[in-house]
Structure formats: C-alpha cells, structure tokens
C-alpha cells in the first residue's frame, strides 16, 4: 500500500532540489513540512480506512483461511506504521533534495538492523510468530522516522526559525505540490 504514495519522496526531492539550487531557505522549510504533513494526513486516512482496505484486498486476492488470518494479524499491526513510513517518505525526499543522500541511507540501514533484531527477538525469544515479525517491522518504521527527526533537528535546526505555518498549506502551493507529484 505504501509505495502508492512514493510520490511523497520523489516529488519532494525534485522540488526541494530546485529550492536548494535557488537558495530559497523558506521554500526548503515549507517543502519539508508540506510533504511530511501530507504523508501524515494520508496515514491518518489509511488508519481510519484500515478495515475496508483489508476487506478489499481479500476480495481481490483469494487466500486460504489460514493465510487470511496471518495476513490480517500482520496488516492490523503494520498499518500503525503508516504515519512513520509516509512521514519518512517526506523526510527522505527532502534530504535527497538537500543534496544529502547519506541520511536516507543511514536511516534505511538502521531500520533494517532494528527490523531484523526486533523481529528475530519477538519470533524466537517471545514466540510471537507473525505478530512478532509485524511488531518488529512497526518498531523499525518508527525508529527510522524518529531518526529522521533527530537528524533534522541536529543538522538543520536553523531552518526551524523560518517556519510560517500558514504558508505551508497555501492553496496554490499545495496545488503545485500535488501537480508535480501527479505527473
């Protein structure tokens, strides 16, 4: 489901790169908050619609009752990672647009390590089976999101003084954001 919203990363990186090239620190700041905000809004919608999304998936894909039960367990745990994952798409695109591809790489490596360690621990030490794998994934998603926030706060905190909340959701700017991401 998440990669449907990959435009958050791709469009954000292009627009941020343009603002970076123009040395427009205000627009750079707005783009981060806009992309993360849109990601969090979409995640909220996914959380609200999780039941019909899962039912639609099982309508489209025929499975055995056992697979459906396991997939349901996994889905209902992992869906709570939507805010972290979609928010991280915004951060990753923004970091790349800021000519910093190392931070997304560090975050991805950290997420993978956390996911492996947590999933193995939950499955083999706590015998949580598929719920353990899902919980490990969920923890890794939030570890990546919080790492992105910490990296932003540590290395880009000077941009926080440029935040003007009403400019983030300007109608014309939001239209441009979605227009770029649509194409």
Residue ranges and their predicted role:
Residues 1, 37-39, 72-78, 102-106, ...:
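Short alpha-helical transmembrane interface motifs in multi-pass membrane proteins
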Residues 1-47, 85-103:
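Small-residue-rich hydrophobic transmembrane alpha-helices
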Residues 28, 32, 71, 75, ...:
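Hydrophobic alpha-helical elements at and bordering transmembrane segments
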Residues 39, 75-78, 82, 100, ...:
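Residue-level recognition of transmembrane alpha-helices
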Residues 44-55, 60, 77, 116, ...:
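Membrane-embedded alpha-helical segments of multi-pass transporters/permeases
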Residues 49, 65-91:
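Alpha-helical transmembrane segments of multi-pass membrane proteins
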Residues 112-146:
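Membrane-interface helix-loop junctions in multi-pass transport and translocation proteins
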Residues 137, 149-183:
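Interhelical loop/hinge segments that connect adjacent transmembrane helices in multipass membrane
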């Amino acid at each position: 489901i998440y990669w449907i919203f990959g435009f958050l990363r791709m469009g954000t990186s292009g627009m941020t790169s343009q603002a970076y090239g123009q040395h427009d620190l205000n627009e750079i700041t707005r783009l981060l908050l806009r992309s993360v905000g849109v990601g969090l809004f979409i995640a909220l919608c996914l959380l609200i619609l999780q039941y019909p999304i899962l039912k639609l998936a099982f309508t489209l894909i025929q499975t055995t009752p056992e697979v459906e039960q396991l997939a349901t367990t996994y889905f209902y745990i992992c869906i709570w990672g939507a805010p972290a994952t979609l928010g991280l798409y915004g951060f990753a695109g923004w970091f790349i647009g800021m000519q910093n591809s190392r931070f997304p790489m560090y975050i991805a490596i950290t997420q993978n390590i956390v996911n492996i360690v947590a999933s193995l621990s939950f499955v083999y030490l706590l015998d949580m089976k598929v719920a353990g794998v899902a919980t490990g994934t969920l923890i890794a998603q939030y570890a990546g999101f919080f790492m992105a926030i910490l990296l932003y706060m540590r290395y880009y905190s000077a941009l926080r003084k440029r935040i003007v909340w009403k400019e983030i959701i300007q109608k014309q700017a939001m239209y441009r954001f979605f227009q770029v991401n649509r194409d």
